[in-house]
């Protein structure tokens, strides 16, 4: 039902993985999603699972949705007998190579790409639905992203390095030690880190 796929080498610094959630489900099945520091674009290739909670967008078939960095878990519930979704999960800081808005604006947000001009659009989602195979869908995504890399939104190398150090220490690295390792003042780092990752 849930399967993960690795990106091509050129995109692996930015994309954690592609994932597919497809299959028959029982109506009313809940799935818990834990915060992982990443953000996702979700393409509804067919029927979808819905976000639980108030003020959540209804995920309609053949559309694109953006899920910003999460600080708390969220839940999906199935309202159909089957689901088919394809996701692109970006590494922390990975999305900033493709677009400019600070990710802090999207923390804990789930937004229809129809309401957002960030990267993908609903028309792109429709072209994915027309592809015959998953491999063709991933090829379309990768071609689009590689083309967008030419826009060359530069990422401050200190921030991905800091994320790497935080992950390596499993989140136990003291902030002062991290500041020493990346040679930046704490206030400046916090501002950049929030913009690039959506987290404080």
Residue ranges and their predicted role:
Residues 1-170, 174-176, 181-186, 196, ...:
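Alpha-helical bundle regulatory/interaction domains
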């Amino acid at each position: 039902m849930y399967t993960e796929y690795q990106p091509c080498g050129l995109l692996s610094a930015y994309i954690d993985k592609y994932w597919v959630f497809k299959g028959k489900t029982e109506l009313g099945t809940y799935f818990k999603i834990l915060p992982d520091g990443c953000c996702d674009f979700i393409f509804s290739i067919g029927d979808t699972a819905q976000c639980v909670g108030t003020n959540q967008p209804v995920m309609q078939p053949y559309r694109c949705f953006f899920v910003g960095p999460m600080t708390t878990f969220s839940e999906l519930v199935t309202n159909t007998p089957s689901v088919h979704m394809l996701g692109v999960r970006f590494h922390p800081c990975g999305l900033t190579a493709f677009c400019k808005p600070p990710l802090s604006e999207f923390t804990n947000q789930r937004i229809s790409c129809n309401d957002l001009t960030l990267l993908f659009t609903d028309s792109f989602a429709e072209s994915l639905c027309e592809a015959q195979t998953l491999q063709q869908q991933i090829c379309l995504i990768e071609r689009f992203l590689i083309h967008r890399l030419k826009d060359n939104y530069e990422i401050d190398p200190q921030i991905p390095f800091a994320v790497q150090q935080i992950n390596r220490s499993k989140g136990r690295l003291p902030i002062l030690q991290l500041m020493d390792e990346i040679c930046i003042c704490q206030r400046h780092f916090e501002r950049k880190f929030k913009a690039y990752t959506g987290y404080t």
